[in-house]
Every structure is written in C-alpha cells, then in structure tokens.
Amino acid sequence: MRIEVIKREENVLEFYLEGEDHTFANLLNEVLHENEHVTFAGYTIEHPVLMARKPKFRVVTDGKITPEQVLEEAAQKIFDRARAVLEAWKEVLGE
C-alpha cells in the first residue's frame, strides 16, 4: 500500500490509496463516516481497468481536527477490529 497525496488544504485531503481495491477502500470509507468530525468522505476508482487498484479518496472535516487525524483514528479502529476478529477465531479454535 502506498499513499499519494493529490491535494491538501486545511480541512480537505485528497489522495490515492495505491495497491488497494474496493474491499479495503469501502471499509476505510465506512469507518471514516463513523467520525463525527467528518463532513464528507468518499472514494472513486477513476478507471475500472487502468486504475482498478488505485482508489482516489476525498476526506473533508469540520475543521476541529485534520483529515490526517481522522485517517489515523480510522486506521486504528480498523486495526482494533481486525485484532478482535483474530482473538475471536483463536478462542473458537482453542488457541
């Protein structure tokens, strides 16, 4: 995964998330929407063949926190949820 910043303003961040597709992009988008400071979050894949693994994100906040802070919080939430799933599987498998 590689992040390429396209546009950065006070409360707006646009970036490509290279190496990912709808699977992770949709998860990130959903978690971003859980943050009360996010006024807009969305992504598009500009060309279904040429850019299939390069979603373009736009994140806008209310200005109380930066888009970078929102993304950091979202990444941590995704990590925590993945860890919870792993722990649940370990419990089921008796590990």
Swiss-Prot record:
It comes from the Archaea. Keywords: Cytoplasm, DNA-directed RNA polymerase, Nucleotidyltransferase, Transcription, Transferase. GO terms for biological process: DNA-templated transcription. Its EC number is 2.7.7.6. It is found in: Cytoplasm. One of its GO terms (cellular component) is DNA-directed RNA polymerase complex. Belongs to the archaeal Rpo11/eukaryotic RPB11/RPC19 RNA polymerase subunit family. DNA-dependent RNA polymerase (RNAP) catalyzes the transcription of DNA into RNA using the four ribonucleoside triphosphates as substrates. HAMAP family: RNApol_arch_Rpo11 (MF_00261). This is DNA-directed RNA polymerase subunit Rpo11.
